[in-house]
């Protein structure tokens, strides 16, 4: 009988210790034996694409980074030459206390637009003649546009900056596009007819060399 009581006591103690070891920890930085890390979240102040006339000083609106509700220092790479036309990319990065990083980018366009192009508004939807896929132009400054789906490729999520510096001349200046790829254009033409049409070749690692023609809708 004594042996039975001893056995039951040992079993009870073992079970109690086991339950103690299996206690679940659930705090803001730990779940069980796993450590929780909070990646930095970067929030841009102002627009992700900013256009300024050539010769205008550029002042960055800034960016805020947080991890688990606490501010995290931000490092900025890239520069803007406000006296040279072009499309510039600024990259912001932040690292949390565990060494994990996150980034965000801003595009800055420095432009010079002639009076005969400044009055143009090329905004609108243009259908590619090959497949009907839509490229959407949005004017953000005189002679400066964002173009979603510039290649007229179904299923794409690419946005670029296009310029109309004079008359009806158009182009995609060399830039890092929204998907991080180097992108530009060649063989561009725009005809201000009714409906308007334009053509260009997209220079991008994932695009071919075909001339792409679009008609305004």
Regions found by a protein language model. Give the residues of each.
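Solvent-exposed, low-complexity, repeat-rich "mucin-like" stalks and linkers
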Residues: 21-23, 33-68, 131-134, 152
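Edge beta-strands of extracellular beta-sandwich domains
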Residues: 27-30, 103-108, 211-215
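C-terminal edge beta-strand
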Residues: 100-118
